[in-house]
Amino acid sequence: MVKDTKPLAYAANNGYQQKGSSFDFDPSAPPPFKIAEIRASIPKHCWVKNPWRSLSYVLRDVLVIAALVAAAIHFDNWLLWLIYCPIQGTMFWALFVLGHDCGHGSFSDSPLLNSLVGHILHSSILVPYHGWRISHRTHHQNHGHIEKDESWVPLTEKIYKNLDSMTRLIRFTVPFPLFVYPIYLFSRSPGKEGSHFNPYSNLFPPSERKGIAISTLCWATMFSLLIYLSFITSPLLVLKLYGIPYWIFVMWLDFVTYLHHHGHHQKLPWYRGKEWSYLRGGLTTVDRDYGWIYNIHHDIGTHVIHHLFPQIPHYHLVEATQAAKPVLGDYYREPERSAPLPFHLIKYLIQSMRQDHFVSDTGDVVYYQTDSLLLHSQRD
């Protein structure tokens, strides 16, 4: 039933192990550099946050969104709607990334400005700002840790085998996993409990309950506004202007976040216990190239340096990554260059969903394993 994907043995030779007369790189080997060395390689100006520059990106995105809405309402034909929905959904995703930067504090040095802008941006696309910010902080603090990570965490073999066959098939068959984000906000992932909307959820410490309540209220206000607009205009108009673009945004979010932490062709280790460290966990992330979309969604594809140093503003991430690559060496996985649109990544998503099903219940360094029965059912 199970095809085991075994990791290479640990290497003491800067991440390499000898096999015959050649050396193979072992991505799970402790790196020969410290995080301070990576930090020192990044130019000082890359750490500087410019709130006016950050706000200019907000203005850019809001103006594009407003122009798209105005054009769609003015021309109102089905051909334009077919163009409008994916473009507007992509712009919703761009807003999410800017709100994400507010949550990290990379938007500005002002907590008040970060919170204000973050609430406006995230509430407008039905994301509870503080609830998501805090769970995402947990994700960054524990990236690559099987038991403590928060985003797209591998299922252990025990949890996987307790899923019924239909749940397994849906979870690992594209496009179904690309629609799970709203479910995650309400109930988290299999094996975890809690809601991003509940101030008393075990996701949050008591000191942050007030912020969670405020964000949930903002979310509810936006949701109520959409219902009100449906009554005074028409449900179909709100569906076309907002509903379908919202689901395009959700697909972008799940697509991007999954691929930054998975890649069957790249053999990414996951850790437990004493083998995990902040640096080793961060090095399991993957950069991706999105072609023309790269700038639209604010350089989120430069994910390795972002995960190690989330306080770096997005507009400095490309330069910071280039500066750090000589230190990272083979621990940095060079992304495949994209055509104008990143259709090549769909192949990687499908391959990973077909191969990366669960990890062992034991072991401090583990890799994804494949359920051969599920693999065959996906191909049938």
Swiss-Prot record:
GO terms for molecular function: omega-3 fatty acid desaturase activity; oxidoreductase activity, acting on paired donors, with oxidation of a pair of donors resulting in the reduction of molecular oxygen to two molecules of water. A motif (Histidine box-3) lies at residues 303-307. A motif (Histidine box-1) lies at residues 100-104. It is found in: Endoplasmic reticulum membrane. The chain crosses the membrane at residues 55-75, 212-232, 236-256. Microsomal (ER) omega-3 fatty acid desaturase introduces the third double bond in the biosynthesis of 18:3 fatty acids, important constituents of plant membranes. It is thought to use cytochrome b5 as an electron donor and to act on fatty acids esterified to phosphatidylcholine and, possibly, other phospholipids. This is Omega-3 fatty acid desaturase, endoplasmic reticulum.
